[in-house]
């Protein structure tokens, strides 16, 4: 690993949550992106080498592949394709990784989410920071603990609509 890679990893977006569920159940809930990120996801989100498609209107479209899965411990997804309607450099998310490190802590579990490669220098960083913070600290946490997250709904406004209004992306 060279110095540039180390710096990029250390500056990558990251959030840590603690949930009151066992690590294996936590792992299973994370893999169901429809339960906490978006009901409009197409494809499998829980099988290694499978690619799923996420979109929110024409504002954000991406294809993501699960590249590593260690039950109860770790999930790594790689962004294969990405398009944002509100930035110039469409390569910002391409080849970045969504990493979920899962650690048992007594009766609870710690989940550290890192979007490796999503760094403050990126044009999308502030919007993406807001989005991931909401999805990880609210929707994913609630989904793991109660079975009810707050994914972006198919047929009505949700968290993404709030973000689009806040950042003037409509």
For each feature predicted by the language model, list its residue ranges:
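Generic structural detector for well-ordered beta-strands
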Residues: 16-20, 53, 65, 101
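Glycine-centered tight beta-turn/hairpin loop motif at sheet-sheet or coil-to-beta transitions
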Residues: 10, 57-59
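Hydrophobic pocket/interface hotspot
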Residues: 26-30, 52, 66, 77, ...
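Short, P/G- and charge-enriched loop/turn segments at secondary-structure junctions
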Residues: 2-4, 52-53, 85-91
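A conserved amphipathic terminal alpha-helix motif
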Residues: 117-170
